[in-house]
Structure formats: C-alpha cells, structure tokens
Amino acid sequence: MSKIIAINAGSSSLKFQLFEMPSETVLTKGLVERIGLEDSIFTITVDGEKQKEITNIPDHAVAVNMLLKKLTENGIVKSLDEIGGIGHRVVHGGEKFADSVLITDEVLADIEELSDLAPLHNPANVVGIKAFQEVLPNVPAVAVFDTAFHQTMPESAFLYSLPYEYYEKFGIRKYGFHGTSHKYVTERAAELLGRPLESLSLLSCHLGNGASIAAVEGGKSIDTSMGFTPLAGVTMGTRSGNIDPALIPYIMEKTGQTVEEVVNVLNKKSGMLGLTGYSSDLRDIIAKEEEGDHRAKVALDVFVSRIHKYIGSYTARMKGVDAIIFTAGVGENSAIIRERVLEGLEYMGVYFDAKRNNVFGEEAFINFPHSPVKIIVIPTDEEVMIARDVLRLGNIG
C-alpha cells in the first residue's frame, strides 16, 4: 500500500487529496485559498470533520509545508516517508504530451514553455510542482495533463481552417480540455455497461461552470467542443463559447475596449452571466425562470441548444452512439438540465425515464430499459485518475 497526493494548483489556490493506493481510499482532502493574499484559508478534512484555519500563507511553498505538517500532526501519515508519490494536474500539455509523464527537469521546462498556450494555468501548475520538489525532492512526481486525452483527435477534428503555417509555426489548433474527466467517465461507463471500451461510441457531457462535450470512440477522443483554449464550445457559466470571430474587432470599435479587455469579457462576463445579467449559477437561473423571468428562460434555452448542436454533430461523426454520459456539477446534480438536453432525442434512440432521472451526485442509469442508447450519470473523479497515473508511472510498490 502506498500513499499518493493528487494536487491541483491554481494561481492563488492549492487543492489536494491524499489516497491510499491501490485501494483508492481517500484519507483526507482539502483546499488552500487566497495564497499570497491577506487572510489565507486552509481547509482540511480529518476523520470526516472539516477543519478551517485563517492564517498568512505568502506562497505555494508555505502552503505545501503547512499541508505536510497537518498530515503528520493529525496522524493521517506517521511520517512523510509514507508518501510514495505526488500527482499534479497540469492544464496544457500541447502536442508534446499525449499521456501523463514522470516529472524531470526536462519535463518541467517543457511545461513552462507551454505557458504561452495556458498563461493563466500552466505557470500556477509549475509553481505547485516546484513547491513540492523543495520539500519532497526524492518522491516521484507525475504530471497529468487536461489536454492529453484529446491528442488522439484526427487532423479533421483538430485543425482550424486557417493558413496551415499557423499550425506549423505557432501550434494553433484545437487541443480540448477536461480530458482527465472525460477519460474517467468513459472508462467507468464501459464498466457499468459491462462492455469493452474499445467497442463503444460514447458522448461525454462534462457540464459545470466550465463545460465541454467529447466524442469518444473505442476509448479514444475523436472530437471535443473546447478548442485552442477553454473559451470555445458550448455556452458556459461566464464563458461565451463559440462566437463569430469578427465580433471581437466590432466590439472593440463600439466600446473602445482593447483586445485583452474584450477577451476578458468573453471569459468572465459572458455565458449565462452575460445572458441573464445577474448570475452564472444555473440553480439561480432555473429559480428565476420559475418566477417568469424571460432572460432566464432564454439563457437556459441557449445553453441547451448549444449542447444539442454537439450531440447531433458527434452522433453523426460516430454513426450513432451507445451511451450519453452526464458528469460534473450540473451534469451530476441538475435533473432539470438533463431532462431538457434529452427531451426530443427519441429520433436517435434516446428514451429517458423522468423517475430515474431524479438522482443527484450518484451513479445511475436514467434511461428506460428498452432505450437503444443508454443514459448514465457518473460523478467525475479527476483526482483518482491522477493517483492511478502516479501508481502506474511512479514505480511505486
């Protein structure tokens, strides 16, 4: 048995989960927030109870030291020698990484180089990796990339209709994201269906504040809705999803905003927040719709219609589907959104059962038994995928 930490480092946060492997038992989990700001918050779960501490955490190295100290203080590990491996979520692996990889100096340099493609995320991921290297230099560390799963997409899916030299010189192409989540739920779907993954055509709907759809054929991603960045695809909480690119100079001209300001609007002030004017949270928007709010209704209609576009096009790409999977915050917990997405899909063999659909955050088949296409709710678990990859690549006994 070995203890493995799964880490997701943001620019001012550090999310962690400690596993006993290979049993995949979660020993503890927690979150460090507001790193580098006043009143940093450290939260850890001990014996099922959340402990919260407000303190000064100036950087990620201090956060890591505090985390490791809490593990020993609370008897979660007897000593740091019990930690056999560390897995780091890294947002962008570009074309260089089609799988998770053991972190070396060379790999770390490559991740830093790819920061151009993910300026908000990769630098923070690197800071997290370096912080652990300082404290646990001899413990194997593995990078798990959000983009890696989608590296199986064919050129017809990942190339944009732009001058080919842009792809050759600048790496401009579709990369896709949420790969670790799509991989987990499609593998789990095959187990639940009792069929080999290689024989299945699956539609994976990762619907949260960020949302993406993936077409997975024979266990391989053949297309996905996010693009060069996580801004593309379906309408999201605060992100616009796909728009006509000519809108950017038009908005700049009309508002006097810079490119950076317009892109910030597309990332942080658009999507459901932009359409409603008051919230990015679908629960708020559904409640408002029930009160008769027109913009809430329109926003929800837009959200569902954009998902339908991908379901239709990916079903055509795969010449039919065996199952549709719902995962992430909205996909796992909103029976209303699932119902609206599935309504009217009988033409493609989708027959959902409204009674069975009344589930929240648990695995369930929500189709009628006679439905040719199965519909499965599967809570995602990116952390366990990270831990599995550490076990697989870290030579951990």
Swiss-Prot record:
**EC number(s) recorded for this UniProt protein:** 2.7.2.1
Residues annotated for Mg(2+) binding in this entry: 8, 382
Q: Which Pfam families match?
A: Acetate_kinase
Q: What is its main location?
A: cytoplasm
Per its record, what are the GO molecular function terms?
A: acetate kinase activity; ATP binding; magnesium ion binding
Q: How is the cofactor bound?
A: Mg(2+). Can also accept Mn(2+).
Cofactors named for this entry: Mg(2+); Mn(2+)
The alphabetical list of record keywords is: ATP-binding, Cytoplasm, Kinase, Magnesium, Metal-binding, Nucleotide-binding, Transferase
Please list the reactions this protein catalyses.
Answer: acetate + ATP = acetyl phosphate + ADP
* InterPro entries membership: Ac/propionate_kinase, Aliphatic_acid_kin_short-chain, Aliphatic_acid_kinase_CS, ATPase_NBD
Residues engaged in binding substrate:
89
Gene Ontology biological-process annotations: acetate metabolic process; acetyl-CoA biosynthetic process
One Gene Ontology CC term in the entry: cytoplasm
Functionally, this protein is described as follows:
Catalyzes the formation of acetyl phosphate from acetate and ATP. Can also catalyze the reverse reaction.
Q: Which family does it belong to?
A: Belongs to the acetokinase family.
Q: How does it assemble?
A: Homodimer.
Q: What is this protein called?
A: Acetate kinase
**Gene symbol?**
ackA
